Amino acid sequence: MLNIKIVRLHPLATLPAYATAHAAGMDVAACLEAPVSVAPFSTALIPTGFALELPIGYEAQLRPRSGLALRSMISLPNTPATIDADYRGEVKVILINYGKEPFMVQHGDRIAQMVIARVEQVQFEEVAELSATVRGEGGFGHTGIASVQ
C-alpha cells in the first residue's frame, strides 16, 4: 500500500478516509469555522484543513460525491480537480450548486471524494499527420444514443 504524508492544518480537521473496504475514493470533509451557504448557480471554495505530500508520479483527484449530486445538485465544476505532487498548500474544494435552493455546508460534512492516481509526464513529438483509424475524427455523440447490438 502506498504511504502518503498528510498534515492536519486545523485541530478539528477530518482526514480523508475510505468509507468501505473496497472504495476507490476517500471521503473529504469540510473544515469550517462557520457554516458556508452556496447560493444557487454559485460556487464556494471550501477548506479541508489538511495538506498532502504526494510522491512524484502521483496526483490526487477530487471528485463529486454521487449522493450530493443526486439529492442536492452539488458538484465540483472542475471535476476531476487535480492536486499535483509538488503542491504543498491546503487542499480546498470548489463546490457548485446547480440546484434551486441555497446549500449549507457544515463543518465535517463530506463534500467530495479523493482518488490517488498514477500520472506520467510525456513528451510530444510533432508530426505532419496522425495514423488513420476506423473512428477517424468522429466524436461528440457520433455513435448515437441507441444501444449497440
UniProtKB/Swiss-Prot annotation:
Molecular function via GO: dUTP diphosphatase activity; magnesium ion binding
InterPro entries referenced in this protein's UniProt entry, alphabetically: dUTPase, dUTPase-like, dUTPase-like_sf, dUTPase_trimeric
Catalysed transformations (reactions): dUTP + H2O = dUMP + diphosphate + H(+)
* Swiss-Prot/TrEMBL keywords: Hydrolase, Magnesium, Metal-binding, Nucleotide metabolism
One Gene Ontology biological process: dUTP catabolic process
Give binding positions for substrate: R65, S66, G67, N78, T82, I83, D84, K92
Pathway participation = Pyrimidine metabolism; dUMP biosynthesis; dUMP from dCTP (dUTP route): step 2/2
Listed Gene3D superfamilies: 2.70.40.10
Cofactor(s) this protein cannot do without:
Mg(2+)
This entry's Enzyme Commission designation comes to 3.6.1.23
Which CDD domains does UniProt cross-reference here?
trimeric_dUTPase
Q: Which NCBIfam families match?
A: dut, PRK00601.1
**Function text:** This enzyme is involved in nucleotide metabolism: it produces dUMP, the immediate precursor of thymidine nucleotides and it decreases the intracellular concentration of dUTP so that uracil cannot be incorporated into DNA.
Write down the PANTHER family for this protein, in alphabetical order.
DEOXYURIDINE 5'-TRIPHOSPHATE NUCLEOTIDOHYDROLASE
Q: Which HAMAP family match?
A: dUTPase_bact
Q: Which family does it belong to?
A: Belongs to the dUTPase family.
Protein name (record): Deoxyuridine 5'-triphosphate nucleotidohydrolase
- Source species taxonomy: Bacteria, Pseudomonadati, Chlorobiota, Chlorobiia, Chlorobiales
